[in-house]
Amino acid sequence: LIRVNILNARSKNQAKKIAFSIANSPLVKTAVAGEDANWGRVIMAIGKTEENINQNKVKVLFGSNIVCENGSISKKINIEKLNNYMKNKTIEINVKLYMGKFYQTVYGNDLTYEYLKINADYRS
């Protein structure tokens, strides 16, 4: 299970649009399935919304693990702690935009090889 929390958005609509873009991204889903805290894929999902944000203010966390802040990789990453976190059944992706007071939480699922294989082999 993936829980995406968008915080400090300019509007409720902006928060919702970005949250769903992250939760529905096949690249984010496969990264989570592979236990990879790939913050670049999160940033890509934000960017494809074409929402006007300040990329130099964005902070991305997996759980409480800061992976990106001020538009670049965080110097505070604890790889061991982050890798352990990514083994959890529920992964929380927190994005702080620092643009306003609005927030949105959405849920999604990962995308595993097993899921793809089952559905690729399925015939109706």
Feature annotation, model-predicted:
Residues 1-8:
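Short glycine-rich or small-residue beta-strand-to-loop segments that form or flank ligand, phosphate
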Residues 8, 13-124:
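Internal helix-turn-beta structural module
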